[in-house]
């Protein structure tokens, strides 16, 4: 079974890679929905734009969605935002994902002026999506201003992620979510002897319990990127008469452009652009765009380099770095869209980087440039002149062309012309006139009604050859060669002379042919599909062109003379067609409405090949053979068309067709050899395509073989000969058992459900008994075995609902429709199986294995539209065939579902042949030829030139070993010795962690080994490798008709969550072990300093490993760790995936009827719970069973006399044969891929769903106590806008964390009194203002299976009027109970006990079999003992599930929880688990600001003193109210030396735990007029102090000095402040209060109010009224003058009002 499991896992892995490859490369124009969440955590060191500091806020742009903004923080350079923003409804195709980005701008808010930009940074969406878990977690971004070069303007800490519809948000446990302020000292555990003086001082400071926060350590390596642009050639003139071109290059947030070269189509730029690049890179794209400058209008966009960005091209910085950092001078060709063909608004989209990425349809010239990436710590942004350069070597090529025929469903006019453009040079074909068939009117009405209108243009033999040969010098390297662009023009020439000019031409369609295409190598005509110039989808087809295009070097062309190709020669061919069956036909139709008829058209003949047979999966088993006259060279022949129609009564609906190239069907046989067996047909899947969509697929094969016979119109040999593909001896007889539990989670309920079980059969004569054949004659036309069952319980309810009512003497039976319940969860609990007499035919050859079709529908004829269906491949369950063959056939079938895009490929047969396993009858010559074809194809398409590969090898050898890949992702499990080097290189393409974004691609050359000779590999390894490699190559080429760099298969940058979790666990264990050793060394006071140094160094090495761990490990003096203890295992991957391995049943997905390109319908969340087993039976037993049935039917009176012994004998013989079969399967390799043994089951007493006893378990009521433990939610989607008034008036938008108020609803059942609880609404506990709510609550519900099988938990958002659903998750309780091996074994034991007790009761009074009864009793006691011995301390793991919204496609968040679904008897034994939310602990901070020292004077020229005051703020997360607390000291006036005395106490409330326990101290210069000027600030973290608080009641910090810093004056001394601090708990603070400042109660210590700097003279010091500048006499004179002035004023008052004193 290990071999089987490994084979199945291998094939699933391969198919998963294939699906990803198709999704990435085949549907570039298909938009997918994404959701982005950005969390702005904090900013540090922001440059101050005003005197009092900046008032920063962050503005976030994501693609073309409206920007969002954070709240504004006042007067600070280090601020905490801690806000999350959700960007929904982001629809992007693959190219838009590569082009668009997240832009973060930090802006200074001004009330009455323009808001200046502080700095910005960008993150590429594609870079983010390729990172680990699609996220950057707590990443520091350096802010850059466009006008300030690369000088940092501050630092921004962010977390962000992007998810698609199939992705889940990243999850981090509570310990990882802790903020870590201690990242400023990386040498904390390094011995002092190894540090310099400055490092030792910093280390001493950082060992204190209260430390300042420094700027983030810049761990990014700086590189210099040189983009050297030499020149351009053949640039187009888009408007006017000149081309004034320039080139703009963008790297990250920096943009540079060359000078504008006017009036030249061959501009010479000679410019070198210098970009500083930092690793890891957060935006890895290098974008180069070529423009045509216009003076009085907007510039014309010409083209971009690269045209289609890819993660593996040269213009990805990570890829460039992995290839050695150097790309030599190369030509890059430009492909654009002519102005008349451009869609409206295309230029605006290009400028805004929002282009839809329209494929270039016209050649626009080429650019010579090079890239160089090297380490340089002094790189500066700018332009330099370019020195010498070396152009790539060139070679002269010649292109020849012949045109023969054009077929199009579009009217291209009376005349057409074909133009071939290669590297800017053009040749044109002769004009061709539209053809009018003379025999068109002679076609019968039946055929003409089915024939679609086709416009045909045929060149005469004398006009087909284009006499002009195009000669051109192009680079020798094939990756630098331009595409051959073939354009179709409709021409309106002069009617007399047939002359025309450019104005008479209108381009209709085009095709781009890669120069590496094998179609250009040989001189033979081929059919090409042309695309319309204005296409809607990239797969749209305009017309088919038969032409011959040759591209050869001049030397080869001279050696090979050009011969005219004539088409008039005819040849007789023997056509053989093999149509086995259809699969998943008409996804939008029901099976009853599907009756397919097929019509073959080859040459001029139209033949009906398949008559109508009902069913979506049908077996035709038809082969036909006839003679046909075709072109001698099949390249000229038109495609073989098979049209399909759906018969609806007398009407026939066209549903699509398949097209096969005639030349691909040719079979060549050496007629000289005698007795050669006919070649075996090569079967493959063909999709029935209609308007680009698949309407199903068929399994067929077609052959064309030359014949020496002559065509005689009256000869019978010309008539088709029909036969069967497989005869009776090619089948095996099987019995299919299908234990059906039921259907779960239907989107729309069904009132009268019935279940249909259907398997297609080649015929039914042997299947149905005589009686059934008479009753159901219609089955002989359907050709499938079918069983229909109904729901018995619903029938009984319906009968009870019938009411009889008498009206006018007549009795009518009326069903109360309103009492019928629409069921969404239906239990059938029955075993569907065919009788042994009705054994089904299954082909021995597994490639013809039929599909089991299941359908659930409503019996009522009026509502038959409510239907769901599913298809199951029987290969997994077939008991014959080895594992390798089955895996190959599974891959063959799965690829058949996905190969619709291969129909667009020019060489699909070469690809499909690799999917088919070589038959045993194939000779070695055919095998060797296939291997040689594969090698040639690989040589032509997958490698560069010899010289280029040698350069890459040399560069890779010199690259740093530290940047090699750490792990490989196996694309295919092949033998290492036989594995091609190119595939080994592909396996090395994997992602590193998000902290090391320098992703490496170990691309080693295989040209050296190929130069020494090809190595002959085994057949098995070659075919497996060829399938994988050619599939990637062909899928890439089929959808990419253009490229600017070599082919590199797209590889997703992902790392499995299991690997990541194991890596973290291993690191944590190592760190803990080493830390414990250090602690023991300190505790025992050992003097082995060397050992201690070594251990400390190892700890630092582990912490500074490539992957930066974000879990917070608080290191105290003892080195211990402090983390949240979950008390159980944490499972990050979906637990359901693990549980399904132990389920005793399978779950088959249900689909609704509807169109879907790669599936059988519209997928739903509904499933069928059932299992499947295929039993092979001997023909003798079948005949014996049939004979007994016939005898019984002949004598109906003796039907009941058919003794039980007779039936038991038949069954016993059957069981014996099945046992023999099963035994042989165990001994040999022939056994099903599916395992029927559940993991962890007791093999003596297994849970066997194929026994009715266990199947009835799902019908009985099974009581559960379900305990739901909700811990917390992370990254939930914001629900509404909440924004500050300033930003709202400015027109901004924001959806932030303050807009979500989550609460919980558990269960959706109805409560039955107080004892049975099935629904809990916890709206009393609402989490306020958060996207990461913490619940830490347990909810206990009652559940009864199967009624309450689905548990629903909803996260609601509390609204002002109506509560809205944020998201929900559902849990299948049946899966949880039966997926846990302990619970499943317990249920199995109890079931066996009940069965044995029934047997004991049955044999209670039968004393003859007392031994059997005693044996049952012994087993009962044994099982009871086993139940008691089971583990009763079950600790189910913590898991993460996605929150889904019924109306939204993307995930709405993640919930952290664990579940205990225990039976009642188990719930009584196991008590509920205890979960406690970290309770807030309230403290009080008593901070005393004593003095300041050396505070600088803000403007020494104008002022000689400074008026000092301090502002202290406590972060909002440290306050229980969630508000920032800001307090100020009084002002120390007139300080000349920067010293100030305050003796000022501040009291702050503190609550822990908190995210940011920080105090920000800012010193300012007081100003009576205007704003105060900020002189410096420092932020101190209390995180270490909080740990001390948990150990004791009081934390006290003695008087300590902290230095001030200012981001505008880096490295300058801004003074310091002397403070002391005491933190006590709230109870102690309330019992012993203190006052603010020097207020009462003034104690502990008593603070004296300072007098220095508080007088009026101090206030006026330094101004024009400064008394200190006067002498003593001047001051005395002033006093006298003041006295005289007061006396005069008093006398004047008495003079004006003399009675004032009397009054």
UniProtKB/Swiss-Prot annotation:
Traits of the deletion mutant: Gene knockout results in defects in mucocyst release when stimulated with the secretagogue dibucaine. No significant effects on the biogenesis of mucocyst and their docking at the plasma membrane.
Biased composition (Acidic residues): 916-928
Keywords: Exocytosis, Membrane, Repeat, Transmembrane, Transmembrane helix
Top-level taxonomic group: Eukaryota
Disordered as annotated region, ranges: 913-937, 970-1025, 1194-1228, 1628-1651
Cited InterPro entries: C2_dom (IPR000008), C2_domain_sf (IPR035892), FerIin_dom (IPR012968), Ferlin (IPR037721)
Record's compositionally biased regions (Basic and acidic residues): 993-1009, 1641-1651
Family matches, as Pfam families: C2 (PF00168)
Biased composition (Low complexity): 1198-1209
GO annotations of cellular component type: membrane
Annotated TM spans: 1681-1701
Membrane topology classification: Single-pass membrane protein
GO biological process, one term: exocytosis
Domain annotation C2: ranges: 18-141, 207-332, 1466-1595
Family: Belongs to the ferlin family.
PANTHER family registered for this protein in UniProt: FER-1-LIKE, SPERM VESICLE FUSION PROTEIN FER-1
Function of the protein: Regulates mucocyst exocytosis.
Name of the protein this chain belongs to: Ferlin 2
Upper classification of the organism: Eukaryota, Sar, Alveolata, Ciliophora, Intramacronucleata
């Amino acid at each position: 079974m290990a071999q089987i499991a490994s084979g199945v896992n291998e094939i699933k892995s391969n198919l998963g890679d294939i699906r990803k490859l198709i999704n990435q490369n085949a549907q570039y124009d298909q938009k997918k929905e994404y959701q982005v969440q950005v969390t702005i955590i904090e900013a540090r060191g922001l440059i101050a734009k005003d005197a009092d500091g900046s008032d920063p806020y962050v503005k976030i742009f994501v693609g073309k969605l409206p920007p969002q903004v954070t709240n504004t923080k006042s007067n600070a350079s280090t601020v905490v935002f801690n806000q999350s923003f959700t960007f929904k409804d982001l629809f992007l195709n693959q190219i838009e994902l590569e082009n668009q980005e997240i832009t973060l701008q930090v802006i200074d808010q001004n009330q009455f002026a323009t808001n200046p930009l502080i700095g910005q940074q960008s993150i590429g969406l594609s870079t983010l999506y390729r990172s680990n878990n699609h996220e950057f977690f707590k990443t520091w971004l350096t802010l850059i201003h466009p006008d300030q070069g690369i000088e940092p303007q501050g630092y921004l800490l962010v977390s962000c992620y992007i998810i698609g519809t199939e992705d889940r948000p990243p999850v981090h446990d509570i310990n990882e979510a802790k903020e870590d302020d201690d990242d400023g000292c990386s040498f904390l555990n390094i011995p002092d002897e190894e540090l310099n003086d400055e490092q030792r001082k910093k280390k001493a400071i950082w060992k204190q319990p209260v430390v300042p926060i420094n700027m983030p350590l810049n761990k990014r390596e700086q590189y210099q990127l040189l983009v050297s642009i030499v020149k351009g050639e053949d640039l187009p003139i888009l408007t006017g008469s000149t081309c004034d071109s320039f080139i703009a290059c963008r790297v990250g947030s920096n943009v540079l452009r060359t000078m504008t070269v006017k009036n030249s189509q061959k501009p010479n730029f000679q410019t070198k652009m210098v970009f500083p690049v930092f690793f890891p890179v957060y935006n890895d794209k290098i974008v180069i765009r070529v423009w045509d400058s216009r003076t009085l209008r907007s510039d014309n966009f010409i083209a971009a380099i690269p045209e289609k960005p890819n993660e593996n091209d040269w213009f990805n910085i990570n890829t460039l770095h992995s290839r050695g950092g150097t790309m030599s001078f190369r030509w890059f060709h430009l492909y654009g869209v002519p102005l008349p063909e451009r869609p409206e608004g295309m230029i605006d989209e290009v400028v805004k980087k929002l282009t839809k990425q329209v494929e270039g349809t016209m050649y626009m010239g080429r650019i010579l440039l090079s890239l160089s990436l090297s380490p340089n710590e002094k790189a500066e942004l700018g332009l330099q002149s370019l020195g010498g350069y070396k152009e790539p070597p060139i070679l002269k090529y010649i292109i020849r062309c012949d045109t023969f025929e054009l077929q199009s469903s579009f009217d291209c006019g009376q005349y057409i012309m074909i133009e071939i453009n290669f590297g800017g040079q053009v040749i044109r074909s002769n004009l061709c006139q539209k053809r009018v068939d003379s025999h068109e009117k002679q076609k019968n009405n039946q055929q003409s009604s089915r024939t679609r209108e086709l416009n045909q243009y045929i060149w005469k033999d004398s006009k087909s050859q284009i006499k002009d040969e195009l000669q051109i010098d192009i680079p020798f390297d094939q990756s630098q060669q331009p595409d051959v662009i073939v354009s179709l023009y409709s021409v309106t020439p002069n009617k007399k002379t047939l002359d025309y000019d450019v104005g008479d031409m209108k381009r209709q369609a085009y095709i781009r042919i890669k120069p590496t295409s094998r179609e250009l190598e040989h001189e033979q005509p081929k059919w090409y599909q042309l695309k319309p110039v204005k296409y809607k989808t990239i797969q749209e087809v305009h017309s088919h062109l038969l032409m011959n295009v040759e591209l050869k070097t001049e030397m080869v062309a001279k050696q090979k003379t050009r011969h005219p190709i004539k088409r008039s020669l005819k040849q007789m061919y023997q056509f053989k067609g093999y149509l086995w069956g259809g699969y998943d036909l008409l996804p939008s139709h029901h099976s009853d409405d599907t009756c397919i008829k097929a019509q073959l058209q080859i040459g001029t003949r139209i033949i009906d090949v398949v008559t109508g047979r009902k069913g979506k999966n049908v077996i035709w088993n038809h082969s036909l053979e006839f003679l046909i006259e075709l072109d001698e060279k099949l390249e000229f022949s038109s495609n073989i068309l098979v049209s399909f129609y759906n018969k609806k009564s007398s009407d026939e609906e066209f549903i699509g067709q398949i097209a096969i190239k005639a030349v691909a069907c040719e079979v060549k046989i050496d007629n000289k050899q005698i007795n050669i067996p006919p070649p075996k047909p090569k079967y493959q899947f063909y999709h029935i395509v209609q308007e680009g969509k698949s309407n199903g697929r068929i399994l067929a094969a077609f052959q064309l073989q030359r014949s020496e016979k002559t065509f005689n119109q009256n000869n019978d040999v010309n008539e088709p000969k029909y036969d069967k593909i497989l005869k009776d001896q090619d089948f095996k007889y099987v019995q299919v058992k299908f234990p059906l539990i039921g259907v779960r989670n239907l989107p729309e309920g069904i009132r009268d459900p019935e279940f249909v079980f259907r398997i297609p059969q080649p015929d039914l004569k042997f299947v149905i008994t005589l009686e059934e054949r008479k009753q159901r004659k219609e089955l002989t036309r359907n050709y499938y075995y079918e069983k229909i069952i109904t729901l018995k319980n619903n029938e009984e309810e319906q009968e009870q609902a019938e009411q009889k009512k008498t009206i006018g003497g007549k009795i009518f039976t009326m069903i109360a429709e309103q009492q019928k319940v629409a069921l969404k969860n239906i239990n059938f609990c029955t075993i569907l199986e065919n009788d042994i007499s009705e054994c089904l035919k299954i082909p021995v050859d597994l490639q013809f294995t039929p599909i089991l079709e299941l359908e659930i529908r409503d019996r009522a004829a009026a509502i038959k539209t409510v239907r769901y269906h599913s298809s199951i491949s029987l290969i997994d369950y077939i008991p014959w065939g080895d594992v390798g063959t089955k895996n190959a056939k599974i891959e063959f079938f799965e690829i058949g579902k996905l190969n619709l895009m291969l129909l667009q490929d020019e060489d699909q047969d070469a690809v499909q042949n690799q999917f088919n396993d070589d038959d045993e009858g194939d000779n070695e010559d055919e095998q060797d030829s296939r291997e040689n074809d594969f090698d040639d194809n690989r040589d032509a398409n997958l490698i560069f030139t010899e010289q280029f590969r040698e350069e890459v090898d040399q560069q890779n050898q010199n690259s740093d070993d530290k940047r090699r890949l750490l792990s490989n992702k196996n694309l295919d499990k092949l033998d290492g010795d036989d594995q091609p080097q190119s595939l080994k290189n592909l396996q090395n393409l994997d992602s590193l962690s998000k902290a090391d974004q320098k992703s490496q691609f170990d691309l080693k050359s295989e040209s050296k080994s190929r130069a020494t000779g090809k190595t002959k590999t085994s057949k098995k390894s070659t075919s497996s490798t060829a399938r994988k490699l050619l599939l990637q190559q062909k899928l890439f080429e089929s959808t990419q008709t253009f490229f600017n760099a070599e082919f590199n298969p797209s590889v997703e940058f992902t790392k499995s969550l299991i690997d990541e979790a194991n890596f973290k666990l291993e690191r944590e264990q190592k760190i803990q072990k080493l830390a414990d050793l250090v602690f023991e060394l300190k505790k025992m006071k050992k003097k082995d300093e060397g050992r201690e140094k070594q251990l400390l160094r190892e700890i630092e090495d582990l912490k500074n490993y490539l992957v930066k761990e974000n879990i917070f490990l608080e290191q105290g003096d003892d080195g211990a760790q402090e983390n949240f203890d979950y008390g159980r295992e944490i499972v990050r991957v979906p637990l359901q995936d693990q549980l399904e391995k132990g389920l005793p049943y399978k779950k088959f997905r249900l689909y609704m009827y509807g169109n879907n390109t790669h599936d059988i319908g519209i997928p739903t969340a509904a499933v069928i719970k059932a299992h499947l087993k295929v039993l092979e039976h001997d023909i003798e037993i079948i005949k014996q069973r049939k004979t007994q049935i016939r005898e019984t039917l002949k004598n109906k009176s003796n039907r009941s006399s058919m003794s039980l012994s007779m039936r038991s004998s038949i069954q016993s013989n059957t069981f014996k044969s099945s046992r023999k079969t099963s035994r042989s399967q165990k001994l040999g390799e022939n056994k099903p891929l599916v395992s029927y043994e559940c993991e962890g089951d007791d093999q003596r007493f297994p849970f066997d769903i194929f026994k009715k006893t266990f199947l009835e378990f799902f019908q009985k009521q099974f009581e559960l106590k379900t305990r739901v433990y909700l811990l917390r939610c992370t990254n939930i989607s914001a629900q509404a806008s909440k924004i500050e008034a300033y930003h709202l008036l400015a027109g901004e938008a924001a959806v932030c964390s303050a807009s979500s108020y989550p609460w919980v609803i558990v269960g959706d059942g109805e409560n039955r009194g107080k004892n049975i609880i099935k629904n809990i609404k916890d709206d009393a506990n609402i989490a306020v203002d958060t996207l990461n709510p913490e619940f830490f609550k347990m909810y206990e519900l009652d559940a009864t299976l199967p009624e309450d099988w689905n548990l629903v938990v909803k996260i609601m958002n509390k609204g002002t009027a109506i509560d809205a659903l944020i998201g929900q998750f559902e849990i299948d309780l049946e899966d949880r109970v039966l997926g846990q091996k302990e619970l499943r074994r317990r249920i199995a034991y109890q079931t066996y006990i009940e069965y044995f007790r029934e047997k004991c009761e049955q044999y209670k009074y039968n004393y003859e079999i007392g031994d059997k009864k005693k044996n049952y009793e012994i087993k009962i006691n044994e099982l009871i003992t086993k139940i008691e011995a089971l583990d009763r301390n079950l600790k189910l793991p913590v898991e993460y599930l996605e929150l889904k919204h019924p109306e939204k496609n993307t995930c709405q968040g993640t919930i952290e929880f664990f579940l205990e679904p225990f039976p009642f008897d188990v719930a009584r034994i196991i008590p509920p688990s205890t979960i406690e939310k970290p309770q807030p602990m309230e403290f009080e901070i008593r901070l005393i600001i004593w003095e300041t020292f050396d505070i600088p004077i803000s403007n020494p020229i104008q002022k000689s003193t400074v008026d000092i005051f301090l502002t202290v703020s406590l972060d909002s997360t440290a306050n229980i109210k969630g508000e920032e607390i800001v307090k100020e000291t009084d002002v120390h006036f007139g300080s000349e030396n920067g010293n100030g005395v305050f003796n000022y106490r501040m009291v702050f409330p503190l609550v822990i735990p908190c995210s940011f326990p920080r105090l920000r101290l800012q010193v300012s210069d007081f100003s009576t007029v205007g704003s105060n000027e900020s002189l410096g600030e420092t932020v101190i973290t209390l995180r270490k102090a909080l740990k001390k608080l948990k150990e004791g009641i009081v934390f006290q910090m003695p008087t300590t000095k902290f230095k001030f810093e200012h981001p505008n004056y880096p490295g300058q001394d801004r003074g310091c402040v002397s403070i002391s601090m005491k933190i006590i708990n709230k109870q102690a603070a309330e019992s012993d209060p203190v006052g603010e400042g020097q207020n009462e109660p003034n104690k502990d210590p008593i603070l004296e109010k300072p007098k220095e700097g508080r007088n009026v003279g101090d206030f006026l010091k330094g101004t024009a009224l400064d008394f200190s500048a006067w002498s003593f006499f001047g001051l005395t004179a002033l006093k006298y003058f003041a006295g005289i002035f007061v006396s005069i004023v008093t006398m004047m008052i008495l003079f004006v009002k003399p009675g004032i004193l009397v009054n």
